[in-house]
Regions:
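Short secondary-structure boundary/capping segments
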Residues: 28, 67-68, 117-119
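Helix-adjacent hinge/juxtasegments
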Residues: 51, 56, 60-93, 97
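Zinc-dependent deaminase
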Residues: 1-21, 85, 89-164
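Short beta-strand scaffold segments in enzyme catalytic cores
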Residues: 26-34
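A short acidic/small-residue loop/turn micro-motif
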Residues: 44-46
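Short, basic and Ser/Thr-rich N-terminal targeting/leader segments
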Residues: 22-26, 72
Length: 164
């Protein structure tokens, strides 16, 4: 297992924890000098906030641990391609390299829909996509399949109650 796979696996485990909590399974770690300095997982539902993204949580924790907002020596590993908000935070934090697993065709801002890292901002993180891609895709598909089944069951249950 490569060092990159080791860190992505740590992010993937956080994604699994998010799924167990009923959140979309996205996990993230920030790494500096070979050590994890920030961890985050999706918590939009739990915290009732649109800002509850894994990347934002991991970046905030890394900034606190390292004592500053410039994370230019850090890499970020995330299971799902960052959205525009998170890509902006990555640029602002000066993250060196972003590794992501699954592409996001609906909100991906690192190549799928757009690539904020290619725009003329003051910082351009390097980008590595597709790391542990299948594991990340499988986790997302499993979550959304279960969510759809649960919603169908709830709908059927409501129908039964109305017909009684």
């Amino acid at each position: 297992m490569t060092e990159q796979e080791k860190f992505m696996k740590a992010a993937w485990k956080l994604a699994q924890k998010a799924a167990e909590e009923g959140e979309v399974p996205v996990g993230c770690v920030v790494v500096c000098d070979g050590k994890i300095v920030g961890r985050g997982r999706n918590r939009r539902e739990t915290k009732k906030t649109a800002l509850g993204h894994a990347e934002l949580e991991a970046i905030q924790k890394a900034c606190k641990k390292l004592g500053g907002w410039r994370l230019h020596r850090c890499d970020l590993y995330v299971t799902l391609e960052p959205c525009p908000m998170c890509a902006g935070a990555i640029i602002n934090a000066r993250i060196k390299t972003v590794y992501y697993g699954a592409s996001d065709q609906k909100a991906g801002s690192c190549g799928s829909l757009t690539n904020l890292f290619e725009l003329p901002y003051n910082h351009k993180p390097e980008l590595v996509s597709g790391l542990m891609e299948q594991e990340c895709v499988d986790e997302l598909q499993k979550f959304f399949k279960a969510l759809r089944a649960r919603k169908r069951a709830e709908k059927e249950h409501r129908k039964q109650l109305q017909s009684e």
